C-alpha cells in the first residue's frame, strides 16, 4: 500500500478518518465491568486513551493486528487488555521486558509490544528494560510517562519533574533523574 492510497481524498473523508474507531480496538469494553461499555475507565486528562488509539491505528494501517501481542504490566497499563483486540499477557510489576523477550524469542513472527507506565518502567522495571535494550531484543516498548504514580493516587515517581509537587512530595521534587541520559549507553536506535 502506498502513501497516496492511505491519504484522505477530501476534507470530509479526513474528518471521518479522525473519528473512525480503529479495528484493533474493541467496539465496546465489557471486561471493565461498568455500565457504560463504550467509554474507557481512565481519569480525565489521562493520555492512555489517545495512546491506545494511536497504537491501534498503526496496527490497522500496517495490517499486523493478528501478529501483535501486548504486554501489560501492573499499573494503569494493565488495563490495555480491556481495549486492544490482539494477544495480551499481563505481567508482574517491572517484568514486562522479560515476558516480552520470552514471547519474542519463542514466537518469531509475533510483534511484541510492551506498554509500560513510569512506575513500572522507570522504577521497579528499569534494570530489565535497560538490559532488554542492551541485548537488542525484538520488542517495541511504549513508555507512558505521566510523571506520577497515577493509579495509586499521584505519588512521586522516578520521572516526577524537578519542582513538581505530588501527594508524597508536597514541596516539589528535588534532583533530576533523566531516563534518556540513563539509556544513552545502550546505543538504541531511537530514544525520545
Predicted regions and their residues:
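Thiamine diphosphate
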Residues: 74-150
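Glycine/charged-rich beta-loop-alpha catalytic/anionic-binding loops adjacent to active sites
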Residues: 30-40, 78-89, 110-113, 161-167
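Phosphate/pyrophosphate-binding betaalpha-module
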Residues: 128, 134-179, 183
